[in-house]
């Protein structure tokens, strides 16, 4: 490394130390975040936040509140849910007359609406199972609830017990009502649930002040509050708050759950914090306590964590570009055992550019460690193509992977699934007055196979000629049932991309969808300001 590059790096370290804002270590628009120009400052309890309307004594989300659907006091009928401000039947139900019924198990409309709908009304001594009238339930997974045969492990109307319906956009996971995907809105302090495949959204709920990272354990949602520095708890079914907050370090950026342990990477606190739960979740929530910690030193800015066995790998975004290996075999005494230096990697800088690796996300695939390199210049703009660093845990070699400037700038998040490595690229964002995004270049997803070949790409963009569309920039994402749910760092959206058997990518919810619809508006947005979907997780 040249002396000028080292001096430039030291200068950047000093500038980040002077910033002093909790979000400077996120790696997302550091100057913008530090300036506080994002929308949705938390307001006092008497005022409804962004995305909510005051209806009598409550703040209601008119887009998804079944009691205030599209307007205050507009209530949906029993069995209906509210989506985009309209009452409708759930995906597994059919409108028969004026009621939403599940024709697979409804004895009055078995197999379809009775009469002209192709179904039939079962006799009083019969039950309805899989759309057929029978004398009894025959499937080994079926339980008789009244005259309906249902699977208590997955039936949203009888989840875990007869007549125990799941609400809104929830699914039934192993007899427990929950959401398939949860997204966090940093600006407004809210979380929102999404039902996989149907892409239905729940009512947004306030959890803390500025949720920065999410995790889940049993039926509890874990929310790391980026400003209050607390690990908050909420129920996964309705996001109602639970007691048991735990103090975290500054700017908690990533949560990794390995029951009974919870690992939290505190980016401005420069620590790895290890918590352990003491009890099963009850009405009082989880009892958590910190049992171990590693302090990495000032201006390291650890970003994320991934594991091979009891060995953790954590990238440092600030300071010298490094990845540390931490032995957590004894979580009460974690220890750094190796430091991998990334500064001498060939970052393929653009002509005349001085660029820094800025390692962020990390994932394990095919027994190797892959680290996303944002590859930014001193002004935090892309100084070269989106890159990855690969660490071989056996040989301890470190190599660089060029994702290609033709499709990827600012490699941001990554995850392994279905024998492939998926990488999101935040792109190059061009701002106008007031930090309004005017254009985003080379944001999307790159898919690599085991040979580290690019097998598929997807570019996120507004539809050609569309007016008023905020240029999207995708960041963190979750994978659920062969679908990527990608958080938008500019307009509060979630884009949905399906992965086919050959790893080809098909946009299902976006501005250019194939047999789909528009992107999900997960987080509300004030005119002229950014709205940040800061984290997205899939619930096991």
Functional labels for PLM-detected ranges:
Residues 1-18:
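N-terminal secretory signal peptides that target proteins for export/translocation
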Residues 4, 19, 30, 137, ...:
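Serine/threonine-rich, low-complexity intrinsically disordered segments
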Residues 38-40:
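C-terminal motif of bacterial Sec signal peptides marking the signal peptidase cleavage site
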Residues 20-36:
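Bacterial N-terminal signal peptides
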Residues 7, 11, 31, 35, ...:
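Compositionally biased, low-complexity segments
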Residues 43, 171-540:
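Predominantly soluble domains enriched in secretory-pathway, periplasmic, or organellar proteins
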Residues 42-179:
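Cysteine-rich modules of extracellular adhesion/ECM and protease-associated proteins
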């Amino acid at each position: 490394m040249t002396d000028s590059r080292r001096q430039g790096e030291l200068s950047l370290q000093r500038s980040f130390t002077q910033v002093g804002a909790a979000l400077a270590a996120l790696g997302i628009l550091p100057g913008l975040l530090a300036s506080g120009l994002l929308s949705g400052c938390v307001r006092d309890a008497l005022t409804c936040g962004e995305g909510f309307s005051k209806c009598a004594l409550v703040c209601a989300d008119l887009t998804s509140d079944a009691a205030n659907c599209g307007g205050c006091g507009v209530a949906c009928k029993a069995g209906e849910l509210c989506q985009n401000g309209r009452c409708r039947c759930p995906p597994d139900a059919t409108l028969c007359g004026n009621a939403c019924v599940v024709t697979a198990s409804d004895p009055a409309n078995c197999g379809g609406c009775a009469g002209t709908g192709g179904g039939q009304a079962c006799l009083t001594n019969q039950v309805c199972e899989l759309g057929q009238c029978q004398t009894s339930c025959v499937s080994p997974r079926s339980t008789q609830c009244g005259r309906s045969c249902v699977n208590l492990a997955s039936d949203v109307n009888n989840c875990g017990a007869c007549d125990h319906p799941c609400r809104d956009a929830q699914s039934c996971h192993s007899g427990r009502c929950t959401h398939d995907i949860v997204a966090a809105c940093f600006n407004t302090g809210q979380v929102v649930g999404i039902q996989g495949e149907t892409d239905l959204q729940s009512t947004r709920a306030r959890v803390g002040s500025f949720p920065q990272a999410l995790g889940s354990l049993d039926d509890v949602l874990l929310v790391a509050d980026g400003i209050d520095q607390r690990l908050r708890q909420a129920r996964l079914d309705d996001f109602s708050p639970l007691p048991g907050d735990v103090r975290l370090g500054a700017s908690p950026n990533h949560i990794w759950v390995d029951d009974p342990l919870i690992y939290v990477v505190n980016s401005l606190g420069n620590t790895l914090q290890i918590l352990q739960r003491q009890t099963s979740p009850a009405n009082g929530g989880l009892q958590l306590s910190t049992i171990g910690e590693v302090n990495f030193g000032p201006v390291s800015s650890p970003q994320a964590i991934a594991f091979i066995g009891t060995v953790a790998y954590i990238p440092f975004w600030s300071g010298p570009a490094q990845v540390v290996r931490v032995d957590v075999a004894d979580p009460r005494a974690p220890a750094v055992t190796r430091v991998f230096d990334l500064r001498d990697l060939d970052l393929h800088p653009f002509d005349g550019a001085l660029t820094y690796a800025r390692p962020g996300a990390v994932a394990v695939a095919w027994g190797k460690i892959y680290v996303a390199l944002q590859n930014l210049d001193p002004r935090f703009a892309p100084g070269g193509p989106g890159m990855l660093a690969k660490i071989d845990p056996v040989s301890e070699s470190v190599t660089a992977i060029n994702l290609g400037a033709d499709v990827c700038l600012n490699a941001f998040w990554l995850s392994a699934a279905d024998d492939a490595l998926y990488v999101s690229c935040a792109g190059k964002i061009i701002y106008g007055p007031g930090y309004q995004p005017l254009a985003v270049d080379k944001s999307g997803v790159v898919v690599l196979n085991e040979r580290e070949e690019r097998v598929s790409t997807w570019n996120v963009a507004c539809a050609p000629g569309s007016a008023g569309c905020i240029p999207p920039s995708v960041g963190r994402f979750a994978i659920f049932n062969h679908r990527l749910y990608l958080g938008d760092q500019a307009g509060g959206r979630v884009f949905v991309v399906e992965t086919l058997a050959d790893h080809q990518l098909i946009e299902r919810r976006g501005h250019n969808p194939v047999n789909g619809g528009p992107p999900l508006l997960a987080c509300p947005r004030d005119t002229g300001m950014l709205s940040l979907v800061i984290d997205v997780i899939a619930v096991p």
